[in-house]
Amino acid sequence: MRAGLCLAGLIVSLLTISLLAAEKSIDVSAIVPKTEAEKILGEPVRNPTPLNVNSKDGYYSKCNYYGTKSGRSLLLRVRQAGEGSVDPLTEFDQIASSGGKMKVIEGVGDKAGMFTGAPENGLPPNVIMLYVVKGRSLITIGIGGIADEASALEKAKQVAEKILAQL
């Protein structure tokens, strides 16, 4: 009986630790530091002002990097949904149906899509926005100022994979 209770306690503890590890808050500015943003954008960037906050909707981490030589930019956002808040998959679907034309991106997270700088998407030229859902998290990566859309998407996917590895 005593051994059974100890075993049950151990299992509950391990499950709790696993659950907490899976829901740990992340800092996107630590995952993609300034030096890496400079490599992604191909030029020096200004010092960012990251923000990491808990709110009634969950945990939110954001960081923007802006190039010093051109209009290039890298925008990073992660929302880890809290209990009772909008589910990330629902939020993704709302974004996808917001009037633009979202391109489905395979092989990243549970679900991913991208808006480009096409007029129907309401974005300026040479801008992509990649949205990735993984579990209770919605990742948003914006890259601006890179004319080659395929290159910008590849860079955004690499950033997404780095963030996904920390969730």
Tell what function each PLM region has.
Residues A22-K24, S29-A30, K34, E38, ...:
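A short, solvent-exposed beta-edge/loop patch
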Residues L15, L20-A21, V53:
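Intrinsically disordered and other compositionally biased segments
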Residues C6-I17:
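Bacterial N-terminal signal peptides
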Residues K39-N126:
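Short, solvent-exposed recognition patches
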Residues M1-G4:
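N-terminal secretory signal peptides that target proteins for export/translocation
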